[in-house]
């Protein structure tokens, strides 16, 4: 983009145009919890003024492997023994993982007593695989940062950021127009909603089949998608964008419920269906879509945990199921990177394509590789990042801070962390706009490839599997964490380089 050729006056004009477009198209956080005098307050989501330049081959590699990743994590979610083998031990030292694992066990016990017509075998995954473009003397390509299986965010507003940069190009705010490339047309909104809509259709077909077998007349209702959210949610526009797309394109109604109010849902024990009552009517729930629930603090009470179990046992399709949530833990990512683990689930070209994206990772246990990881953590910490099982940003420990953190905790707790080698991300320059004026930074980019999959956990049949667009986050090179909602990074779009 040759951003060094822009004058301060041009950057100021570009910043004003980008900021106005962002507000006009919902690229904002809402600050309902701090509104004053009854006013709603919105702040612009941090954005880049220019698209992020990503090597063509690296981007194609990341996009091409997404369907294999979708299938991989669906299979992991179905594999109780694999999850038990690698996760049960860390539940002793991680309260959140312990609670999730206990819910999973209780769900398995409850399912064993359900009648066939009360059991839901279908599951929905809305996934995001995050990468940085790694470069060394002999290699340039994508290395995976993490794989997310719950509450993947910014698929809604990322489409608007792509449109924002297109507007800047078409309206003359760039010195040189962007080159149109079909590969970077962002289908994040339609892609995610296609997956959710397919799950709704699968639910309808499944329920219709049940009623037909039992000679019960269908009630002809249109089941809904239920977004489970947190109170005072800031990222509303990202979520609402998906709701509007579901309604306008797929004619699927969505409703929202605070995780603290899950006990208001209605569970019909005879049919095992889930219902939501509003001031207007009562809706049958086809899909429960969690946009919260990935952190311990998200659950305000034991009742919220109990209701997640109740929902898990109903006929509604869950996104994600508890087993899919567990499959997305950092420990599973680390285990997959070890030799032979991946062969349990994939083979051939898919196996090789997925394996090529793995970064170097270590456990911190008493296995030979774990002992090697412990040695590296203390002797060469500057080459690594230490990751707990938690999602949401702001939880990692970097470089020289790693030995101090490990020294403060009992050694038996180290196994609940993984050690990951730094990805040598390709740097560039960009302007980040999150206040009144854009600021120029040396930056690195993280691309997140979105995917959706609907599958049958009893038969392993895949009903739908697709790559569903992308997001791009850009952060100052000196910043370790990469979360937009936590204030570390900004949203961008992608322009490809040869």
Curated annotation (Swiss-Prot):
Heterodimer composed of a large and a small chain. Transmembrane segments: none annotated. ATP binds at residues 146, 330, 387-396, 398, 420-423, 446, 475, 481. Binds 1 Mg(2+) ion per subunit. The modification Phosphoserine is found at residue 356. It is an enzyme of class 6 (ligase). Belongs to the eukaryotic GSH synthase family. It holds the Pfam family GSH_synth_ATP. Its EC number is 6.3.2.3. It comes from Schizosaccharomyces pombe (strain 972 / ATCC 24843) (Fission yeast). Pathway: Sulfur metabolism; glutathione biosynthesis; glutathione from L-cysteine and L-glutamate: step 2/2. GO terms for cellular component: cytosol; glutathione synthase complex. Substrate binds at residues 128, 150-153, 233-235, 239, 291-294, 473, 484-485. The gene is gsa1. Keywords: ATP-binding, Glutathione biosynthesis, Ligase, Magnesium, Metal-binding, Nucleotide-binding, Phosphoprotein. It comes from the Eukaryota. NCBIfam families: glut_syn_euk (TIGR01986). This is Glutathione synthetase large chain. Its cofactor is Mg(2+). GO terms for molecular function: ATP binding; glutathione binding; glutathione synthase activity; magnesium ion binding; protein homodimerization activity. Mg(2+) binds at residues 146, 148, 391. It catalyses: gamma-L-glutamyl-L-cysteine + glycine + ATP = glutathione + ADP + phosphate + H(+). GO terms for biological process: cellular detoxification of cadmium ion; cellular response to cadmium ion; glutathione biosynthetic process; phytochelatin biosynthetic process; phytochelatin-metal complex formation.
């Amino acid at each position: 983009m040759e951003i060094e050729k822009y004058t301060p006056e041009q950057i100021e004009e570009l910043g004003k145009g980008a900021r106005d477009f962002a507000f006009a198209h919902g690229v904002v956080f809402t600050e309902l919890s701090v509104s004053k005098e009854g006013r709603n307050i919105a702040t612009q989501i941090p954005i880049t003024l220019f698209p992020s330049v990503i090597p063509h081959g690296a981007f194609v590699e990341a996009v091409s492997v997404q369907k294999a990743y979708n299938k991989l994590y669906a299979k992991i979610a179905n594999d109780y023994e694999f999850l038990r083998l690698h996760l049960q031990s860390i539940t002793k030292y991680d309260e959140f993982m312990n609670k999730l694992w206990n819910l999973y066990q209780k769900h398995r016990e409850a399912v064993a007593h359900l009648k066939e017509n009360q059991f839901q075998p279908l599951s929905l995954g809305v996934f995001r695989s995050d990468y940085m473009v790694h470069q060394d003397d002999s290699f340039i390509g994508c290395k995976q940062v993490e794989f997310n299986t719950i509450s993947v965010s910014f698929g809604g507003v990322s489409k608007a950021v792509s449109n924002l940069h297109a507007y800047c190009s078409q309206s003359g705010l760039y010195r040189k127009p962007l080159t149109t490339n079909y590969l970077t047309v962002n289908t994040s909104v339609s892609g995610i909603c296609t997956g959710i809509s397919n799950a709704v259709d699968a639910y309808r077909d499944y329920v219709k089949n049940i009623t037909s077998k039992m000679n019960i007349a269908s009630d002809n209702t249109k089941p809904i998608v239920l977004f489970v959210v947190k109170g005072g949610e800031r990222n509303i526009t990202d979520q609402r964008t998906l709701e509007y797309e579901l309604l306008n394109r797929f004619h699927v109604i969505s409703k929202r419920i605070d995780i603290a109010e899950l006990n208001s849902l209605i569970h019909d024990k005879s049919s095992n269906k889930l219902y939501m009552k509003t001031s207007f009517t009562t809706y049958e729930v086809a899909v429960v879509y969690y946009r919260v629930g990935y952190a311990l603090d998200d659950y305000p009470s034991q009742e919220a945990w109990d209701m997640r179990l109740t929902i898990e046992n109903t006929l509604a399709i869950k996104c994600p199921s508890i087993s899919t949530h567990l499959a997305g833990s950092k420990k599973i990512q680390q285990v997959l990177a070890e030799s032979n683990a991946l062969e349990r689930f994939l083979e051939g070209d898919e196996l090789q394509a997925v394996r090529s994206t793995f970064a170097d990772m270590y456990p911190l246990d008493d296995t030979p590789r774990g002992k090697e990881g412990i040695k590296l953590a203390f002797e060469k910490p500057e080459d690594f990042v230490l990751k707990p099982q938690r999602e949401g940003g702001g939880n990692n420990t970097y470089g020289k801070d790693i030995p101090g953190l490990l020294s403060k905790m009992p050694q038996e707790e180290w196994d609940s962390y993984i050690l990951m080698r730094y990805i040598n991300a390709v740097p560039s320059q960009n302007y980040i706009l999150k206040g009144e004026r854009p600021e120029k930074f040396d930056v690195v980019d993280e691309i997140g490839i979105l995917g959706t999959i609907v599958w049958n956990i009893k038969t392993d049949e895949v009903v739908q599997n697709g790559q569903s667009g992308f997001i791009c986050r850009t952060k100052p090179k000196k910043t370790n964490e990469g979360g937009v909602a936590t204030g570390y990074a900004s949203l961008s779009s992608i322009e490809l380089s040869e």
